[in-house]
């Protein structure tokens, strides 16, 4: 019944950031040649002699369909003979989790490792036992069991063989693609994609392009949360840094909705920049911003920094040059109800940096409405207050009684903001790692226009006092480097930043920090350079 089949020797498909598909062991022909037993569909070397541990279902693979470019799901139907143990119900959990057996248990999608034992497979002596179960293994015969496993299975009623019908739904994406795609020099298959809402985004090498529709359909089939699979093309829009892409499976729908940092973002994925791998970095930076401060987001995109910061209670200037990004940032501002604390603009980043300090001073934000909470939150806070009073009373500490709280109709205001928002920027964000460093010259003299404002001079008691006392903003500049060692990366980044800022930036500058964000490619890392803007730069006189 069994046919001669290939062994899948491909790495797993990995979806980032949300989930990981099962891994298939990578075995080379040389490793097979060194096995003490012949390698067939089920035949395995004893565990103690195998150099490489196999995944639970590594000895079962789909039929080889190498070279096919169109997906035929019926081509993966297969009848497989497997070894199973007839076990009493009370023993099943103990045997399944036993160290000598757990790696032998059948592990295939939509195939149960434990099933009811058919009457025809139960031994005659045990047919009166109710509820017999079959514990299935990924082996075909008893001789393939390691000695330790045989010893443990002496507690089973019998070892039997059964035939299981497997099909397309029983194989994961790695196994299907491994059975279809030809071997390459690197012996790999398309290994990763990112998810953005309902869209799976792949970056296929040229050698896989003839198979792109098959690859896309398999990935779509095996990930029910996706509706669209796209492949990034080589064309990149230099000004706005987004890629052209092609739908290779599913709906031709680029309008994605993503939930991140407690906010909802909707945008057209085909003409704006969004990277789902950066959500932890977004959260890290936003955590540095106290509520009530002013943030200037120079390259805000659709708002991954600006929207959560505004929702947190910061006052945000969100700017981008891409009209589509600005359109969706405005839409997301409405969706997340942060209109009072997010001001959106569409100008060049160089100009935005130059005018932002004066903009905030001369046109400060209106005070934001106080944050509100529901009655449920109000009740939780009241219970917490009572608990603290009871603890104080038990400890013999004086207790101040408060008047009963009035019950509002729906919501109550808590912890109001300061009555007047700040008129100075606390943080600049420059999230365009490919070129943000080249925008640093715009900070030279960006505070000088404030010296012409009488209110600014009066606030600090004179021009020189203002230069000395005004609080300088933090600058967070994202960038790439080809240097992999962190020491060399720091030298490279600081040299380029110093040149563009016309100021010698060193690790000794105020509030300096260099944060490694992620590795983008084998010789390309992303960093966030943070420092407090030097007064000598901000107030420098041109000419």
Swiss-Prot record:
Span of the transit peptide along the chain: 1-59
Gene3D superfamilies found in the cross-reference section: Met-10+ protein-like domains (3.30.300.110), Vaccinia Virus protein VP39 (3.40.50.150)
Major localisation: mitochondrion
A GO BP annotation: tRNA N1-guanine methylation
Major enzyme class: transferase
Keyword tRNA processing on entry: yes
Gene Ontology MF annotations: tRNA (guanine(37)-N1)-methyltransferase activity; tRNA methyltransferase activity
GO CC terms of this entry: cytoplasm; mitochondrial matrix; nucleus
Location of region: Disordered: 366-405
E.C. code: 2.1.1.228
Catalytic function, reaction form: guanosine(37) in tRNA + S-adenosyl-L-methionine = N(1)-methylguanosine(37) in tRNA + S-adenosyl-L-homocysteine + H(+)
Subunit structure: Monomer.
Family indicated by similarity: Belongs to the class I-like SAM-binding methyltransferase superfamily. TRM5/TYW2 family.
Protein name, entry field: tRNA (guanine(37)-N(1))-methyltransferase
Classification of source organism: Eukaryota, Fungi, Dikarya, Basidiomycota, Agaricomycotina
Gene responsible for this protein: TRM5
């Amino acid at each position: 019944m069994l046919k001669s089949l290939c062994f899948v020797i491909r790495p797993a498909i990995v979806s980032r950031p949300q989930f990981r598909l099962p891994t298939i062991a990578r075995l080379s022909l040389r490793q097979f040649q060194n096995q003490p037993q012949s390698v067939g569909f089920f035949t395995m070397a004893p565990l103690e002699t195998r150099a490489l541990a196999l995944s639970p279902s590594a000895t079962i693979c789909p039929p080889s369909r190498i070279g096919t470019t169109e997906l035929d799901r019926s081509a993966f139907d297969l009848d497989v003979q497997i070894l199973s143990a007839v076990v009493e119900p009370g023993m099943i959990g103990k045997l399944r989790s036993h160290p000598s057996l757990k790696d032998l248990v059948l592990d295939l999608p939509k195939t149960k490792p434990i099933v009811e034992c058919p009457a025809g497979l139960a031994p005659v002596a045990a047919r009166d036992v109710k509820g017999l179960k079959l514990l299935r293994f990924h082996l075909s015969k008893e001789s393939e069991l390691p000695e330790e496993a045989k010893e443990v299975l002496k507690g089973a009623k019998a070892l039997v063989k059964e035939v299981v019908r497997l099909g397309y739904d029983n194989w994961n994406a790695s196994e299907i693609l491994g059975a279809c795609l030809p071997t390459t020099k690197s012996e790999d298959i398309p290994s990763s994609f990112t998810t953005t809402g309902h869209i799976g985004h792949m970056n296929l090498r040229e050698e896989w392009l003839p198979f792109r529709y098959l690859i896309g359909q398999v990935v779509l089939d095996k990930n029910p949360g996706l509706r669209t699979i796209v492949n990034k093309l080589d064309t990149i829009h230099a000004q706005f840094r987004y890629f052209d892409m092609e739908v290779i499976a599913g709906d031709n729908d680029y309008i994605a909705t993503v939930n991140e940092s407690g906010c909802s973002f909707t945008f057209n994925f085909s003409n704006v920049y969004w990277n789902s791998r950066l959500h932890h970095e977004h959260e890290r930076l936003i955590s540095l911003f106290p509520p009530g401060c002013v943030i200037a987001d120079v390259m805000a995109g659709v708002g991954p920094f600006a929207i959560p910061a505004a929702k947190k209670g910061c006052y945000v200037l969100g700017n981008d040059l891409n009209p589509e990004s600005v359109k969706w940032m405005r839409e997301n501002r409405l969706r997340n109800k942060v209109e009072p604390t997010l001001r959106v603009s569409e100008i060049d980043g160089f100009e935005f940096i130059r005018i932002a300090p004066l903009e905030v001073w001369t046109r400060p934000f209106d005070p934001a409405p106080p944050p509100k909470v529901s009655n449920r939150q109000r009740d939780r806070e009241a219970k917490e207050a009572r608990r603290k009073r009871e603890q104080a009373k038990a400890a013999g500490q004086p207790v101040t009684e408060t008047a009963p709280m009035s019950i509002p109709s729906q919501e109550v205001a808590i912890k109001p903001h300061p009555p007047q928002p700040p008129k100075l920027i606390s943080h600049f964000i420059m999230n365009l790692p490919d070129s943000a460093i080249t925008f640093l010259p715009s900070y030279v003299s960006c505070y000088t226009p404030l010296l012409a404002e009488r209110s600014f001079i009066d606030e600090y008691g004179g021009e020189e006092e203002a230069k000395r006392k005004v609080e300088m903003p933090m600058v967070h500049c994202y960038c790439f480097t080809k240097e992999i060692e962190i020491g060399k990366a720091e030298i490279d980044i600081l040299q380029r930043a110093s040149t563009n800022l016309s100021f010698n930036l060193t690790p000794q500058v105020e509030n300096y920090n260099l944060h490694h964000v992620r590795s983008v490619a084998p010789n390309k890392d992303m960093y966030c350079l943070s420092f407090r803007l030097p007064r000598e730069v901000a107030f420098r006189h041109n000419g």
